[in-house]
Regions:
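ATP-binding N-terminal substructure of ATP-dependent carboxylate-amine bond-forming enzymes
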Residues: 1-105
Length: 105
């Protein structure tokens, strides 16, 4: 079974665009035959998953899940590419620790 990976990008700093580009680069390099990949865009209170058709759907912050085609999806891993807050100050890391979601940054 393929693991579902979040590439978390965006943030609240002026480097938001750089973070989104980094996420796109990672997305293009990771083997989609082995993993279900989704870019999660964060900016302020907007946390959204970019679906394969390009549409976006909100993240449920209670468990970092989302709905796709009527099915609840949960992430097995989060790759943090956010520059500045909340990716480089421990906020996201603490959130993922509380939820038990492994991550890398």
């Amino acid at each position: 079974m393929k693991r579902t990976i979040a590439i978390v990008a965006g943030g609240d700093s002026s480097e938001l665009v750089v973070s989104l580009r980094s996420a796109q680069g990672l997305y293009s390099f990771i083997d989609k035959e082995r993993y279900n990949l989704y870019i999660v865009e964060m900016e302020g209170h907007r946390w959204e998953v970019v679906l394969p058709d390009g549409s976006k759907t909100p993240i449920d912050r209670n468990d970092f899940s989302f709905m796709e085609n009527g099915e609840k999806k949960q992430f097995d891993f989060a790759y943090i590419t956010i520059h500045g807050t909340p990716g480089e100050n421990g906020i996201l890391q603490g959130y993922f620790d509380l939820l038990g979601i492994p991550y890398s940054s």
